[in-house]
């Protein structure tokens, strides 16, 4: 009898209800200031990160190898036979490589560590789908076979108030970090097949950029039913309006919303608005 554990990292932004429903094991990333280290979503909140960015921009680090080893030892003790792990894009963090390395040292558990090539709720959408399959009684091999297709069907699009935090954190990818800053040109950022940020399109100002996001959604939903996530990072006054705009579009199976993790917020800065599309 298979006993499958689901592992992810804190950038997947799985909420408490999902964690409880699917018994997800979450490995937290770290946020490091000059005088103190915090555990993502555990000992620091997104708002605390944004409130302090004008004073200090912290660095971030992946979950510790010790945390990963301890988790695997606990899973073995609890009789788990299989692990499905879904991580943030390996082009944005070393989490995938570290978890894969740790998993290879535990031969009593058959593991499949999967690079989401995504971030935030794009990563979380894969975890949710795997969790549903486990609850339905699907076996390990069946779920693993379906995961690459899940990844193909997920797209992330977002806008930020400024690119300076992506540039500072070295996460700028293929997004131009100089063009249009003074002209208030906003890139609509997405993630390509390699899990690297790129500019999907551009708009003049945030208002027009939001319109572009809605256009992308309408175009996609006109062709296929989708699950949609609306996300924000420190855009507390704007997220409800965006969700209202999205909710009026047809062919949405499930509409979810949430705030990105503090670790992600370090690299985007306040003001992020975005959507995740999962074609079903």
UniProtKB/Swiss-Prot annotation:
Residues in DegV domain copies? 4-279
UniProt-listed InterPro entries: DegV (IPR003797), DegV_C (IPR043168), DegV_domain_contain (IPR050270)
Q: Pfam families this protein is in?
A: DegV (PF02645)
Keyword entries, A-Z: Lipid-binding
Q: For hexadecanoate, which residues are the binding ones?
A: 60, 93
User: Its Gene Ontology molecular function terms?
Assistant: lipid binding
Q: What does this protein do?
A: May bind long-chain fatty acids, such as palmitate, and may play a role in lipid transport or fatty acid metabolism.
User: What is the protein's name according to its record?
Assistant: DegV domain-containing protein CA_C1624
Source species: Clostridium acetobutylicum (strain ATCC 824 / DSM 792 / JCM 1419 / IAM 19013 / LMG 5710 / NBRC 13948 / NRRL B-527 / VKM B-1787 / 2291 / W)
């Amino acid at each position: 009898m298979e006993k499958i554990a689901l592992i992810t990292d804190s950038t997947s932004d799985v909420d408490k209800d999902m964690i409880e429903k699917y018994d997800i094991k979450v490995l937290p990333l770290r946020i490091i200031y000059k005088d103190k280290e915090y555990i993502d979503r555990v000992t620091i909140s997104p708002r605390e990160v944004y409130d302090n960015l004008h004073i200090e921009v912290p660095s971030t680090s992946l979950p510790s190898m010790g945390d990963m080893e301890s988790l695997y030892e606990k899973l073995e003790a609890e009789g788990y036979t299989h692990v499905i792990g879904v991580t943030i894009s390996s082009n944005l963090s070393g989490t995938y490589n570290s978890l894969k390395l740790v998993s290879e040292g535990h031969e009593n558990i058959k593991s499949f560590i999967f690079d989401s090539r995504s971030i935030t709720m794009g990563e979380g959408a894969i975890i949710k789908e795997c969790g549903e399959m486990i609850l339905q009684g699907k076996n390990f091999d069946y779920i693993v076979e379906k995961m690459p297709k899940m990844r193909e069907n997920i797209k992330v699009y977002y806008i930020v108030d400024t690119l300076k935090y992506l540039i500072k954190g070295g996460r700028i990818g293929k997004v131009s970090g100089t063009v249009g800053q003074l002209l208030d040109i906003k890139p609509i950022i997405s993630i390509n097949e390699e899990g690297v940020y790129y500019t999907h399109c551009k708009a003049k100002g945030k208002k027009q950029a939001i319109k572009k996001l809605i256009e992308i959604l309408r175009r996609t939903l006109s062709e296929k039913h989708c699950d949609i996530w609306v996300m924000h990072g420190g855009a507390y006054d704007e997220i409800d309006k965006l969700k209202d705009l999205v909710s009026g579009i047809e062919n949405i199976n499930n509409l979810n919303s949430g705030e990105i993790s503090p670790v992600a917020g370090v690299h985007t800065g306040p003001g992020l608005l975005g959507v995740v599309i999962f074609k079903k």
